[in-house]
Amino acid sequence: MGSEPPSSPQVVEEGADEEDEELSGAEDADLRSSSGRGSLLTRRGITLRVLLKDGLVEPGDGVLSIHYLGKKFVGDLLNDGKIRWVETGQIFNSPSAWATHCKRLVNPAKKSGCGWASVRYRGQKLVQYKTTWLHKYQPSADMSLISEGEDDEMGDDDEEEGKTTIPVEDKNKKSKPELHEIGLTQRRDRERIPVRYCTLGTRDAARDPHTLVELSAFSAINRFQPFNVAVSSNVLLLMDFHCHLTSSEVVGYLGGRWDTNTQLLTVLRAFPCRTRLADKDAAPAVEEEICQNLFMRGLSLVGWYHSHPRGPALPSLQDIDSQMDHQLRLQGSSNGFQPCLGIICGPYYHGNQGVASTITPFWVVPPPEQRPNDHGIPVAVEVTYVQDNFLTTDVLNEMMLLVEFYRSAPDLVQFSQMWSPNTSILDKIKASLSGHAPKDQAYAQILEHVYNQLRNTQ
């Protein structure tokens, strides 16, 4: 997009962004599910017009800014919620459109708009004002306002590159050690001591976004858990298997159903993302495939998972912001309020009890209304785990696809190496997955075929 002189402003439509269209996938396809329209990465959300209407922000000259790879861009917030870039006078319909345009000027390879996480209003990220809006209006928000047409992405930070799926911790690390070096990294993992939420205070740009935060209990903040959760054992088995395959972080989505009458969220299926976090080109196809799988099975998008390969299964500050952003997106569903479950899996942390992975379901409560610049509060979610009758063909096929995907990966785990003096890594995986076994004991023979494939990858 070329620059226009101030006397002839160019209006950049939000929908004109090729990158936003790529990432949104089936944006106009109604999945007939409580997750509403849009792909798994983007969906209709709160707009600047909504924040202006409700008094959370005010129009003004030079109140918006983007800091990206050492460059600063300044914009005016107009009365109608549009953005005028001060340097050229161009008009943009959304933060995503402006952010994408500016970032492409600095880095032409940039593939994604990321306005709400990158654009700042009076020095504070716009996503923080979304959080304040959610706190005031959840769960009885005006759905017509929520769907006014902002597409944004899950938490693309100002200075960081290389993500294609939902934001995860350590996304900007250029390389990670092989698992056989895990003994060398054990001491470093333990030095990442989680902090208590009460010690965080107001957001501080100087604080490491990878800082881990202990989970609070709903009762500790004088709340009741506003929904019940049931998770299928097959979901845990596939997720745990996925997280064990590589020494790098992985991500995936959770499909299920939300019953507004019983306030029960049932997680029935895991959908691993078979793509590298830095592979921008492959992400849209992977997202579209998962979107179609959800639709064909009559499931809704109900959450996401990611791994902390060698660290505690606790959310980082970055994870907290990502989870809050996900919750905002599902807030705009056709059923009104719908929870979005976050799960962190820690497969190779030596602080785990025994050989089993630590699996942590969590949710984020918006900060107190009088402290809108605080981080959201990460809370532990009580979950009922439901043992499936048998291992489904879907799960088995997905496991085999994952083996093939990571077969030649440089960070593939060395399964024959030792996890402990008496336990190989493959034996550790078997033991961890046995904790998610179905009732039908024939599953062990079925999984042995998968384990043989793992042996053949070395």
UniProtKB/Swiss-Prot annotation:
Entry GO MF terms: metal ion binding; metallopeptidase activity; polyubiquitin modification-dependent protein binding
SUPFAM superfamilies reported for this sequence: JAB1/MPN domain
GO biological process: double-strand break repair; proteolysis
Cysteine pairings via disulfide bonds: none
Pfam family, one: JAB
Renumbered residue ranges of the record's region Disordered: 1-37, 147-175
CDD domains: MPN_2A_DUB
Name assigned to this protein: MPN domain-containing protein
